[in-house]
Amino acid sequence: TAQRLQAHGMDAKNTPVTGAVMMDFLRPEFKGYFKDKETLCKEFGLDPAKQLHLYISSFGYASMTDQEVAELSKMAGTDFSGFARTNRVSMEKTLAWFDRYLGDHPEVELVYRRHPSEWKCKALDELAAKRPNFHVIFADSVKQWIVAADSISIWMSTAVAEVYMAGKSCHILRPVPIEHEYDPVIYAGADY
C-alpha cells in the first residue's frame, strides 16, 4: 500500500493509488487486446458457431486428500475439513448438472476453467470423455475466456471482479451453501 511504502521512506509523490492495473485491460479502450470468440475457439478446437459457456471453478479443496486437508488445517490453525467437504459435494453436484445439461444441449461448448489450486481430477477427465462439448482448459487467462464467452457461471471465485469489469454478468452456481467464513463478501446478498 502507499502508506506502507511511505513509512519505509518513499516520497508520497511516487506512491499514487491507481487501483488494480490488471483490470484496465478489460476497459473499453483496450478492446482488441484479447482474442475474439472465433479465434479463441478455433485455437482450442471448439466450434465458434456454438454457444460458448465458461465455468470458472475454484474447487481447490476437492482434490485434496483428508490427510492434506488435516495438514493444511494444522498449519493454518483452522479446521478446513468442513469446507473441503463442501468443495467435494459442490463439485460432484455441479459436474452432474453439467452432464445432464450438455446431454440436452449439444449446441453448447462448455469450458471448465479450473483454478490453479485444482489438481488432476478423474471426474473432470471422465466427463470430458463422455461429453464432447465439455472441455477442461487451463490455458490462457481467465480474463481472455471471460471476454470471449457468451455466458459465464461461477461457484466462488474472485474472478467475479473481472466479469464485472468486462461489462458482463454471470450465474452463481451453488448446489450447497458455502460456510459463511469462506464465502467472499462480494457474494453477500447474491441470488443463486
Task: Enumerate the language-model features and the residues they cover.
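Structural motif
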Residues: 52, 109, 150-151
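Short, charged/polar "capping" segments at the starts of alpha-helices
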Residues: 2-4, 63-64, 118-125, 178-181
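Catalytic donor nucleotide-activated moiety binding site of glycosyltransferases and closely related
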Residues: 55, 89-137
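A conserved mid-protein helix/loop that constitutes part of the nucleotide-sugar donor-binding site
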Residues: 63-69, 86-97
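A nucleotide-sugar donor-handling region in carbohydrate enzymes
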Residues: 1-80
